[in-house]
Amino acid sequence: MSLRLSSASRRSCPRPTTGSLRLYGGGTSFGTGNSCGISGIGSGFSSAFGGSSSGGNTGGGNPCAGFTVNERGLLSGNEKVTMQNLNDRLASYLDSVHALEEANADLEQKIKGWYEKFGPGSCRGLDHDYSRYFPIIDDLKNQIIASTTSNANAVLQIDNARLTADDFRLKYENELALHQSVEADVNGLRRVLDEITLCRTDLEIQYETLSEEMTYLKKNHKEEMQVLQCAAGGNVNVEMNAAPGVDLTVLLNNMRAEYEALAEQNRRDAEAWFNEKSASLQQQISEDVGATTSARNELTEMKRTLQTLEIELQSLLATKHSLECSLTETESNYCAQLAQIQAQIGALEEQLHQVRTETEGQKLEYEQLLDIKLHLEKEIETYCLLIGGDDGACKSGGYKSKDYGSGNVGSQVKDPAKAIVVKKVLEEVDQRSKILTTRLHSLEEKSQSN
């Protein structure tokens, strides 16, 4: 199904507007052209059912609203009724617009005539001097311009303040992220400092141990020297044939040199280990700083992406809300139309029930009258046979079997020699020839036979 509504444009429109609305649900589209004041809306309803088309024209010469429907077994009866209702509503709307335009034109003609009659330069010479109002008008114009300028400045200041606040917010977020990264770096360096402090404590303990050992060796050396000096201070002369003794001074000097070399080697090893650890820590710190910078940049990009996605989400939510509102409005309109149609259906059903009731009543009356007619015809035939087949007497009774009217009288003779029985059938009919009541009167007269 394809549906298209097009509208024309008014030439005298000061600000034309253009809008379009497309609904994709079975190929339905609505399009509106430039319009203002709705001086003329042109469209045409044409429905193609196996190749036929139709169109309308209303609204003071403007084409009437319409639809183009291509139905190939896909259009149900409800949709036909809906499109017909839409067509009728659009036609009535165009009629009201045309009436309003005519009323506006009439008012414009009246205003123009009044100005021609009573305005400045009219034929009566009623010229008015409005020069005293010009300064007031200029003053008011200046005030309006000043107010507009001040409002524009205020709006500009508000926008600038909003932009400044946004900039400060971004700066605050960046500084907060930088502060957090620096705090993380400081915490990492504190752990490194604790490790270095532990290493320094171990080295101090080793230094104290070596110092105590050196002090102990010095003390032993001093005691040995004192013992040797005391032994050398006596006058005992002992001559011995023995190997030459060991020079203790040289031995102590050698031992001192070895310990000093050992201490220097330990110091160099500790310094090299410390430098190696410090270099590795510096390299790790530099790598962590680079990783932190890249992570900070990535975090900034992610924040920007998050803001963009939030904006898109807000726009999609607004679109969803507007679509829900339009859907609710459409449902309410169709529910109102459905309620109106149901009310009309109920009224028609009530009328149909009333018509059926009246028809049944008329049927019963007709059956009763038909029974009366048949009964009277049988009586007439019986009376004719009793009379003796006298057609003239039967015909002169003033009764016809197929004629019922107000005041019809049938006279039949039961026994011509003894008595005459007269039966009167009285019927009351209304203006529409409807039989209201039927009454049968029997009169018996006795007479002598000739």
From Swiss-Prot:
Tissue: Strongly expressed in skin and scalp, and weak expression observed in thymus and tongue. In the hair follicle, expressed in Henle layer, Huxley layer and in the inner root sheath cuticle of the hair follicle. Expression extends from the bulb region up to the point of differentiation into the three layers. Also present in the medulla of beard hair (at protein level).
Single GO BP term: epithelial cell differentiation
Outcome after substituting residue 238 to L: In ARWH3; reduces keratin intermediate filamen formation; impairs cytoskeleton assembly
Subcellular location: Cytoplasm
InterPro entries for the chain: IF_rod_dom (IPR039008), Keratin_I (IPR002957)
Region (Coil 1B): 137-228
Region (Coil 1A): 79-114
Residues covered by region (Disordered): 1-20
UniProt keywords, alphabetically: Coiled coil, Cytoplasm, Disease variant, Hypotrichosis, Intermediate filament, Keratin, Phosphoprotein
Primary role: Essential for the proper assembly of type I and type II keratin protein complexes and formation of keratin intermediate filaments in the inner root sheath (irs). Plays a role in the cytoskeleton organization.
Protein name stated in the entry: Keratin, type I cytoskeletal 25
Organism of provenance: Homo sapiens
Record lineage: Eukaryota, Metazoa, Chordata, Craniata, Vertebrata
